[in-house]
Amino acid sequence: MVIDHPIFLESIRFIRSHLIANDLNYLEKKVLERLVHTSGDFSVQNLLNFSEGACEKGLQALKNGAPILTDTDMAAAAIKTMAENTTRNKVFTAGMWFGKNNHTNLTKTAYGLSEGWKELSAINSGSKSPIVVIGSSPTALTYLIDILENAKDLPSLIIGMPVGFIGVENSKNKLISTDLPRIVLNSTRGGAAMAAAAVNALLRETI
């Protein structure tokens, strides 16, 4: 059960009264509201990119018990409380697979996320396929897209919001160029808090 503080509710009402993204559907607006609230910046509404039906697919996966795989502990921590208070989806981080890295040409996060995806998707397929949340590592996002190119099972949703200057926009553009279900924050902006906020917006809609 989620009990919102009056200040949070007042903030959301304020945000809604100032949004101009009229082309978004109900769930997309919910995600946008949370991202504006998290960032304190209305310009976010000009940066969001949704693939068609991405929010609906992600919401259904959460209701079905899909696990959530993040690239950082910070993103996982920001999601866990909401997950525990709603559908109790299990939250995993790439760091859980760091110790198995024998590939020196990959970053720890890229390796951990890809191995985590392989393991979790093997036991959670179809309507329970994992949701992947990336708020830090563009390298992990790029590598994930590469290994999914010929994969049989695909994520229910990818939150692509790595932050930074090197490789970030390229990784996001690469995700947008695919048919993968996605929510992307264009530009160099992003981060664990923003990526987690997108997931939490959908988790709120499960109750």
Model-found features: residue ranges?
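Glycine- and other small-residue-rich loops at beta-strand/loop junctions that grip anionic moieties
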Residues: 4, 47, 105, 133-134, ...
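Buried hydrophobic positions in well-ordered alpha/beta secondary-structure cores of metabolic enzymes
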Residues: 71, 159-160, 198
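N-terminal nucleotide/polyanion-binding subdomain common to many enzyme families
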Residues: 1-65
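Conserved mixed alpha/beta catalytic, RNA-binding, or beta-rich assembly cores of soluble enzyme
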Residues: 72-151, 162-164, 168
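Short active-site oxyanion
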Residues: 63-68, 129-131, 155-156
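C-terminal functional extensions of proteins
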Residues: 156, 166-207
